[in-house]
Amino acid sequence: MLPEVYSEEERKAVEEHIEACFGAFETVLHEVVSPDIHVDVCVIPPAKDRNYYTLVTMGMGAHRMNVPAELAEYKLERAELAIALPADWKVDQEAFRDERWYWPVRLLKTLARLPGECHTWLGWGHTVPSGEPFAENTRLCGMLLENPVTFG
């Protein structure tokens, strides 16, 4: 089975949306093996008005999520995920060999696949527990999905 991917037109629209909402990105962590959906991660560097990195998935929305019928009017079946990281977070390929720096990328990719694997959906207010810390350098062990407007 081929992975679900955006059409060229959809991908361009998602790239433009990411830049408009989060800022310009030059770095994209391209996924090499895509078992179900193709999930790249865009890295938006800190800026004058934003003292943090933002990582945004690009590909999760190629899969239409199984949103409950009573929410259909809100058009929530497609989404991407974002996470804010401190300005001193290491975001280079060398650092990503260490799980202490890579776990946010792994987390985004894992969450991006959840709706397809579990025939469900993710949206604002959902929580996803992990049961244990994401890496040895953090006590974080669960996710809360929030409206990205709160990043500022």
Give a label for each model feature.
Residues M1-G152:
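Short linear motifs embedded in intrinsically disordered, proline/glycine-rich low-complexity segments
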